UniProtKB/Swiss-Prot annotation:
Family: Belongs to the Glu/Leu/Phe/Val dehydrogenases family.
Gene: gdhA
Major site of localization recorded for this protein: cytoplasm
Keyword NADP: yes
Source organism: Aeropyrum pernix (strain ATCC 700893 / DSM 11879 / JCM 9820 / NBRC 100138 / K1)
Record-given protein name: Glutamate dehydrogenase
Record-annotated membrane-spanning stretches: none
Taxonomy, superkingdom: Archaea
Description of how the protein assembles with itself and partners: Homohexamer.
Keywords, in A-Z order: Cytoplasm, NAD, NADP, Oxidoreductase
Gene3D superfamilies, sorted: Leucine Dehydrogenase, chain A, domain 1, NAD(P)-binding Rossmann-like Domain
Any one cellular-component term (Gene Ontology): cytoplasm
Length: 418
């Protein structure tokens, strides 16, 4: 199966939402393209004295609801189309979450794993200096993404403050605690997945207690989703990472599985249960499936064999459009990525507000705010789906996109843009 062009996929999803809402074609034409895309050349001197150039981008899709917001990724396969698509998805994610943000995304085509610490810092500073004219506390607020972390955000912050000759701590989120970040940021996406899943389980499965869960992907999102779902009463029976997985119907301890992964390199070395592949985990007889690894793992080739009643998308784009049509017919409920994994950007908003007010907030207070937002958003999408769509024909993703696109459209209309 050929991977889908992410921009084609993003535009197809937008087209479907516009058609379901009954909007004119011009709405699609306006929203199918970003407000602007800046391409930059990042040239640095390597440790061995050679000079290398890397391409980078910042896409600003739409700011009708507020400043652009979205992460920056470092990856050898980043393309401009991917960055544009991701910025579009951030517009819908922020809109659906009820946050005062538009959508933005950045990327640099580089393999950060082969850079020295000095090279990584230089690359980060040069990239952020190159985009400094279009980002800002009230303009565009980047955050961590693939292979970027709080240290990279610290370099971004410092470089921006050097260029702008001020102290603008809200220009990026996902920072270390010492620079105005929040400890709760690391758990936020996984916790949000767990909360959204709990709301859906209470509505459609009679609750989470004793419900079996399989988690594909055991990085930050997968681990914390498993940890919090277990604390909420679910039984984790399978976990996997890129090197394999483990299935034990008697239950798996999420924290023990993490220790095994850290000490041996993979959760597949967990002391009990049956070893499985990272794709086999998708087809296990469980109540809830959490794909939290990579995109396009649930396809029209395996959708028929999926036995879960609820799929909660911890990863971005794990379910293809063709697969979702099959799942809808089977009656499988898919909590879409723009709903289920919005915990990270919601926590980023809490951090941003805190930075702007010069205030402070405890981790417990931050997680409580996040929980309230995730519960509210999940209930809103489910209610809209039941009230305005046909569950046997339409997915929760349809409902989520319709809500998100309608909010952006109304904001643009009110502001006189269209």
């Amino acid at each position: 199966m050929q991977p889908t062009d992410p921009l084609e996929e993003a535009r197809a999803q937008l087209r479907r939402a516009v058609d379901l809402l009954g909007y004119d074609d011009y709405v699609y034409e306006v929203l199918a393209n970003p407000d602007r895309v800046l391409q930059v050349r990042v040239t640095i001197k390597m440790d061995d004295g050679t000079v290398k150039t890397f391409l980078g981008w910042r896409s600003q899709h739409n700011s009708a609801l507020g400043p652009y917001k979205g992460g920056v990724r470092y990856h050898p396969n980043v393309t401009m189309n991917e960055v544009i698509a991701l910025s579009m998805w951030m517009t819908w994610k922020n809109s659906l979450a009820g946050l005062p943000y538009g959508g933005g995304k950045g990327g640099v085509r580089v393999n950060p794993k082969i850079l020295s610490p000095r090279e990584l810092e230089l690359l980060s500073r040069k990239y952020f200096e190159s985009i400094s004219d279009i980002v800002g506390v009230d303009q565009d607020i980047p955050a961590p993404d693939v292979y970027t972390d709080p240290q990279v955000m610290s370099w971004f912050l410092d470089e921006y403050n050097r260029v702008k000759r001020g102290q603008f701590f809200g220009v990026v989120t996902g920072k270390p605690v010492e620079l105005g970040g929040l400890n709760a940021r690391i758990v936020s996406t996984g916790y949000g997945v767990a909360v959204s899943t709990r709301v859906a389980a209470e509505k459609f499965l009679g609750g989470l207690e004793g419900r079996t869960v399989a988690v594909q992907g055991y990085g930050n999102v997968g681990y914390y989703a498993a940890k919090f779902l277990a604390e909420m009463g679910a039984k984790i029976v399978a976990v996997s990472d890129s090197r394999g997985g483990i299935y034990d119907p008697e239950g798996i301890d999420p924290e023990e599985a993490l220790k095994v992964k850290r000490s041996t390199g993979t959760v597949a070395n967990y002391q009990r249960g049956k070893k499985i592949s990272t794709m086999e985990i998708l087809e296990l007889p469980v109540d809830i499936l959490v794909p939290a690894a990579i995109e396009e793992v649930i396809t029209d080739e395996n959708a028929d064999r999926i036995k879960a009643k609820i799929i909660s998308e911890g990863a971005n784009g794990p379910t293809t459009t063709a697969a979702e049509k099959i799942l809808v017919k089977k009656g499988v409920l898919v909590l879409p990525d723009i709903l289920a994994n919005a915990g990270g950007v919601i926590m980023s908003h809490i951090e941003w507000v805190n930075n702007r007010m010069g205030g402070w907030i405890t981790d417990e207070e931050a997680l409580k705010k996040l929980e309230q937002k995730m519960v509210e958003n999940t209930k809103t999408v489910i209610t809209y789906w039941e009230k305005n769509l046909k569950p046997e024909e339409n997915s929760l993703r349809d409902a989520a996109y319709m809500i998100a696109v309608e909010r952006v459209f109304r904001a643009m209309k009110l502001r006189g843009w269209i």
